[in-house]
């Protein structure tokens, strides 16, 4: 039996390198690579793109669109890691745990878009509550999130690594900073479309002086609702939604042992995995709650999710290589 052929277009980038590393040791697939001197040769890329079973695109948005235009074979499946097609018609959103039946859609699709890191954490928290009517679709959602600097790609990684090397590991001039202050972050559209919310969420991302890891925080002012759910009801709804899932873990409710020193929720605790953890914190007296997702921005937020989707697209056990 022939092994499925996989081509990573953009394997030299941050996400591409991570995916290559996860796939390179596997003996159930065949990785096809392009010579470094041919990476910008459209004819050579088109030849490879049309000769494989699955092409994984790890490219900027415009380059991803160009790559898709080069594929003429209906036998080639495409998994795109850019933001170009995450809300596009004809593309299946590659978050297997998003809805019942999402895996089947991914398995049967020719075109699959890999989710963004922030949306993965956000949707893992919010989608179950909207889908089950625990929160109304009109609920005003705010997101505060922080990612390690690897989320900024090679240029930001080099900036931080250079400073750490010069200062022998000292904290950089940018220990923490918020951005996206024009409220036009590229992830908002997919957050809105795939959550079921009536209006886009207000999203404030940040970067911290640590390489990998992510916390996505969603405060819920439940006092704005006529009949607000309790913290336990929120936790129960999310836990039931993900019952039996391998890669979405819902933390125990009110368990201080999950916090570092009983106080802090560490952004880096699941680095190197394809897991997103969901936490629910609540005070029923004040009718306030906080949802938090913790994930590796390069794992379930990027390359891990891509490998999971690839496995589903090939009809393989989705935990292979993870």
From Swiss-Prot:
Coarsely, its chief localization is cytoplasm
Catalytic residues as annotated in Swiss-Prot or TrEMBL? 117
Name where it's found. Answer: Cytoplasm
Q: List the disulfide bonds.
A: none
Protein family per UniProt:
Belongs to the NAGSA dehydrogenase family. Type 2 subfamily.
Function, as annotated, reads: Catalyzes the NADPH-dependent reduction of N-acetyl-5-glutamyl phosphate to yield N-acetyl-L-glutamate 5-semialdehyde.
- Full protein name: N-acetyl-gamma-glutamyl-phosphate reductase
Q: Which organism is it from?
A: Trichormus variabilis (strain ATCC 29413 / PCC 7937) (Anabaena variabilis)
Corresponding gene? argC
